[in-house]
Amino acid sequence: MKKLIIFIATFMMVSSIQAAEKLDLEDITSRCFTASYVSGVNPIEGTDLYASISNDGSQIVSYSFKTGKQVTVLFDAAACKAPFESVDGYELSPDGKRMLILTKRKSIYRRSFTAEYFIYDIASKSLLKLSDGENQQVATWSPDSRHVAFVRENNLFITDGKKEVQVTNDGKFNEIINGIPDWVNEEEFGFNKAFAWNADGTALSWIRYDESKVKTYSLQLFCGQKPALKQYADYPGEYSYKYPKAGQDNSVVSLWSYDVKAGKTVRMNVPLASDGYIPRVKQAPDAKSMIAFTMNRHQDELNLYSFNPFTGEAKLVIKESVPKYVKEEVVEWTRVGNKYILLPSDRDGFMHLYLYDIKGKLIRQVEKGDYEVTDVYGMNEKTGDIYFQSSMLSPHDRQVYVAHANGTTERLTDARGNNAAIFSGDYRYFFNTWSSYSHPYVFTSRTNRGKVVRVLEDNKELLDKVARYNWGKREPFSFTTSEGVKLDGWMVKPVDFDANKKYPVIQFQYSGPGNQQVKDAWSTGSMGNGGAFDYYLAQEGYIVVCVDGRGTGGRGAAFEKCTYLRLGDLEAKDQVETALYLGGLPFVDKNRIGIWGWSFGGFCTLMSMSEGRPVFKAGVSVAPPTNWRYYDTVYTERYMRTPQENAAGYLTNPIERVDNLHGALLMCHGMADDNVHPQNTFEYAEALVQADKDFKEIYYTNRNHSIYGGNSRRHLLRQIVNWFNDNMK
C-alpha cells in the first residue's frame, strides 16, 4: 500500500512538472512576467487626492486615496487640442490652478532628460508653450505659482509664461553648468535638479559646476541597429563628456542666488573646501533663508547651512560627522519642513532618525534599536507623527511605521515581506505596496493607522501565470563562515529537485556597499536578482543561490562599512566561503559551482574567481569595474578614499590578481557604457592575455550599462546560459 501511495504521488508530481509551461528567454525579456502596478502616483499637497497619467498618456486624472476612484480629469490632450498625443510628466502649480506638462522626453544619463514643456490653465483649458527654445530641463513652479524656472543648454531661465529672463549666461557644454548636476553628482548623489526657489518665490538659488578642469572621457559610437545611428554609417564617432576618476580633479562647485525683483545675482558665502560637494539646495520656511548641504571630499562630514539668498550670509545649522563615510541616503532622505529638520544618521551604528528644530537644535532621536530605517516618508507637522520604513522585524523584512510625538512607535503594515508606502498630501491615507518571495505586488489603500480601506491591485493574474510555469520557491538559508561571520541567502532549486542527486550551482551576487539582494520581496527581473532568469536557470537544472556578504546593507554600520578602504577583499572571501558551504551539502556537486554578477557584481565575480581558493568552475562578469582608479570620484572615494591616500587598497583589484584566476571566464560589456567604462574590460582582457589566460569576451554596440535595446538583453542572457551549460554540464 505504501509503495502504491509513493508511486501515485511521484506520478502526479512528474505529471505536474511535465504539464507545466516552459520558460524561454523571450518570455523573460518581453516583459511577459511584468506585474501590474498602481503607478505614477503623485499626492496633491494638503489633500487626500493624487494625480496620475492615464495608461495611454492622453489624460492627467485625480483620484481619491481612500476609494481609488476617479475624481476629475485635470488635463485631456484631445479636449484642449494639444499639439501632442501623450504626456510624459507634469507638475501641478502650488495654487492648483495650472500645470506644467512635459512631452517629447529624451534621456541623457540615468536621471537627466530634456523635454518640451507647456503651461496648462485648468479652468480655461488653455495651453501655452513654456518657451520657444528647445531642450528644456527640470522646469519647476515657484511657490507663489507666478513663475517657472528651467534649464536650457546649461543656463537657468525664469518665465511667467509671457516674458522670459535668462538668469545665467556662462553655461557651456563640458565647461560650466548652472542648475543641473554634472555627470558624477547626478549619478552618485541621485538627483537631476540643482536649484530651488525660496519660500515666497522672490529668489532662486542654484549650484554652479565648473568642470573645465575635469578630464574628458570619450565613448566610441557606431552605426549599429535598433536604433541605427546613421551619422556613423561610414566612420565611427565619439561622445565626449567630463568624467572625474578617483583621485582626479572634480568640478569646482559654488552656490548662487538670483533676486527676482531686483534682477541681481549674488554668490553665497557657504563655507566649502575647493574640492568639496554641494549635493543639495533646499527651500526653507523663511523667504530670507534657504538650506544648503555640503560635504567634504572624503564624505565623512555633512553640513547643513542656512543662508540668506539676498545677502549671501550663511550659518551652520547641523554638522553630521560619522566614522568612515556618510551614506548617500542621508542626503536623499533628509526632510526640511516648516518647523523642523528630520535627519537620518547611523551615528549609533544603525540608521535612525533625528529630529531638529529649524535652527538646528536637536529635539530628540525619533526611534532606536538594532535595526535600520530604510526609507523616510515624511512628517505631519500638525500631529508630529513621523512616517518611515524599517527592518525592525528582520534585516530581510520591510514594514511601514509611524513614530508619534509622545515617543511611541506603531507598525502600520501587517504581512511579513517587503512593504512600502506613498502617503497622501494630508497624511490621512497611504498606498501600501507589499510583496514577498512567493507573492507579487499587492497594492492596498490604508488609513494612517494602517487599516485597509480597499485592495487596488492584487496581481492574481500574474500569480496564476507563474503557477502555470511551475516556478520553484526561493528558500532562505543561513550559514557561518570559517571566520565566524553569519551570512544569509536564498536558493532556488529545480522543480523536480531530488535530494539524492548532485546538482550544479550558480551563485548570483551584487555584493556592493549597502546593497541587499537577500530580501523577502518579489522580483521578476532579467538581471538575476531572484527574478525570472533565476527560475529559467533552475529549469535548466541548476540550483541558483544568492548570498549577501560583508559590506551589504540591512545589518548595521559595522557589517556594511567593514569593507572600507579595501573593496572586493572581504566580499570575494564571502562568496568563496559560500561555495565551500554549498559544496558540503549532499545535493550539490562541489566541482560544478559557477558565479556571475553585473557591475559591482561583475567586479566581485572576478575577485572571487581569483581569491586564491579554486572553487568556481565557471563565471560570467558583466560590465565590471576592474580597477577602482577607472571609476568616478564620488562613489569610489566614499569607500576607498583616493589612490594617493590608499595605494594598497587600490591594488586590491582583479587586474593585480589576474595570475590567480581560475575557471572558465566570460566577460560582457556595453560599448557605450557611460557609467563603468568599457576601458575596465579592455584593460582586464589585456592582463589576461599577458598572463596567458583563456577567456571569452562579448561587446554590445552602442549599449550602455544596462545592455538593453533591440535584441541585446535576450542575446546577453543566452550567452550566460550557454556559458554555464558548456562549462558546467
Task: Report each predicted region and the residues it spans.
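Serine-hydrolase catalytic core recognition
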Residues: 28, 287, 419-729
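Predominantly five- to eight-bladed beta-propeller fold
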Residues: 31, 68, 104-109, 113-116, ...
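Signature of short aromatic-glycine-proline-rich micro-motifs recurring in repeat-based ectodomains
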Residues: 36-41, 85-91, 180-200, 280-281, ...
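Non-catalytic accessory segments flanking enzyme active sites
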Residues: 38-42, 53-60, 72-74, 88-91, ...
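Beta-strand C-termini and the immediately following turn/loop, strongest in propeller blades
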Residues: 51-57, 62-64, 92, 99-111, ...
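Short loop/turn segments that connect beta-strands within beta-propeller blades
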Residues: 65-68, 121-125, 160-163, 259-263, ...
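Blade-loop segments of beta-propeller domains
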Residues: 69-101, 106, 127-137, 321-324, ...
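Asp-box/WD-like beta-propeller blade repeats and closely related beta-sheet repeat scaffolds
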Residues: 111-158, 163-194
